[in-house]
Amino acid sequence: RDLHSFPTRRSSDLNPTVEAEVTVKADGKAGELFTGTAIVPSGASTGQFEAVELRDRDDRFGGKGVQNAVKNIDEEIYPALEGVNGLNQRKVDAIMIDLDKTDNKEKLGANAILAVSMANMKACAKALNIPEYKYIGGITAEKMPIPMMNILNGGAHASNNIDVQEFMILPVGACCFKEGIRWCAEV
């Protein structure tokens, strides 16, 4: 297993965000290596029960830097996962959760943990030559997940008086993900 973090990525709102890259070696494939990457941008607001996105809270980027989260990947998460079979996603995730030891992921940062977990999932799906949704849902998963799209915002950070934070639509019945995206775009 090889794990890298990249501290200079930016999300769509130009805030720094965490990117992780995980490389796994597939058994029985002549030592072939498979790499997955994942970027974890932040939302505009967080609820009181959400996992904590670790931000630096210093002068850089208005306090929204992610150097501490990246440092946690490099110095705590990577050593804890070194030698662990990445194909056991539950074990990979359990190790990170146990390493954090908080209910809301405030020690390592949910952004660090999620980036590594997603990158591991993507690398392992490639190694097994299966779609990511089958890696997550099991090889008996018959349907690919459908997209959820936000069509109207309200709540504390909106410029209206709607109490509901998000109104979302799901293209239930679309034949494929691409068709679901089209249906939502046409709404």
Where in this protein do the model-derived segments appear?
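Acidic, glycine-rich active-site loops and adjacent beta-strand->loop/helix elements
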Residues: R9-R10, S42-A44, D98-T102, G138-E142, ...
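Conserved phosphate/anionic-ligand binding catalytic regions in large, soluble enzymes, centered on
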Residues: R10, N15-A20, N104-A125, I146-I162
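Short, small-residue-biased leader/transition segments that mark boundaries at the very start
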Residues: L3-S11
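Metal- or metallocofactor-binding catalytic centers and their adjacent structured scaffolds
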Residues: P41-I130, I181
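Short acidic-glycine loop/turn motifs at beta-strand connectors
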Residues: V24-L33
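A short, surface-exposed beta-strand/turn
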Residues: L33-G43
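Mobile "lid/hinge" segments at catalytic clefts and subdomain interfaces of large enzymes
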Residues: E142-V187
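Glycine/threonine-rich beta-strand-loop-alpha-helix active-site module
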Residues: A125, I130-M148
